[in-house]
A protein has these predicted regions:
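Glycine/serine-rich phosphate-binding loop and adjoining beta1-alpha1 elements at the start
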Residues: 1-27, 33-35, 106-188
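An N-terminal-biased, well-structured beta-alpha scaffold segment characteristic
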Residues: 13-131, 135-137
């Protein structure tokens, strides 16, 4: 018996082809922080090794990790390039900072560069925003980056660190050598 012919069988059918995404390797710059009392660094050597292992190029300004007790040799062994000149770091596609860049630092940025940093938006002025716009910099405020569950992981981590730091500072100030009574938990 003959099979019935359906009109749909003769229509042009869409074919799903696999499209390979071209993976873009990034160059990521880590600057030495210039804000007073800022001892943090944007990436630790272990994170650098992970990114380098995924074919990204990391350029670390010489001495960027010293305040956080990371030597340049540790970054170098993790696969980062150590740049003596700040200008070399600013040639990267992406700049990571722990503190917002100053107006002077924004001058070093080039068009279509990406800045990932806390921007402290409630504290910045229109001149700051205008300079970023003039430079055509895409600025991502770390403090507003959300996780899949809607939380702000960087804010949570910084809050935890601030809480631990407050306890340790208070304990230090309460010691007899710092002028305190030398009692950390009185009455217990």
């Amino acid at each position: 018996m003959a099979k019935p012919i359906y009109f749909e069988e003769h229509l042009t059918q869409a074919e799903m082809l696999e499209v390979k995404m071209k993976r873009q390797n990034l160059s990521i710059g880590i600057l030495k922080e210039t804000m007073p009392m800022e001892n943090r660094v944007a990436l630790v050597p272990a994170s650098v090794a992970y990114l380098v292992g995924n074919n990204h190029r990391i350029v670390v300004q010489a001495g960027a990790g010293l305040s956080s007790h990371f030597q340049d040799i540790e970054y170098s062994e993790a696969g980062a390039e150590i740049a003596a000149a700040t200008e070399e770091v600013y040639k990267c596609d992406v700049i990571l900072k722990v503190a917002p860049p100053t107006l002077d630092e924004i001058e070093f940025f080039h068009p279509d560069q990406i800045l990932i940093s806390p921007l402290q938006i409630p504290l910045i002025n229109s001149e700051y925003i205008q300079k970023l716009k003039e430079k055509r910099v895409t600025a991502l405020a770390m403090e507003y980056m959300k996780d899949d569950d809607g939380s702000f992981p960087l804010v949570r981590i910084m809050g935890e660190m601030a809480g631990i730091s407050a306890i340790l500072t208070a304990a230090n100030l309460l010691t007899a050598t710092s002028g305190g009574t030398g009692v950390l938990l009185g009455g217990i």
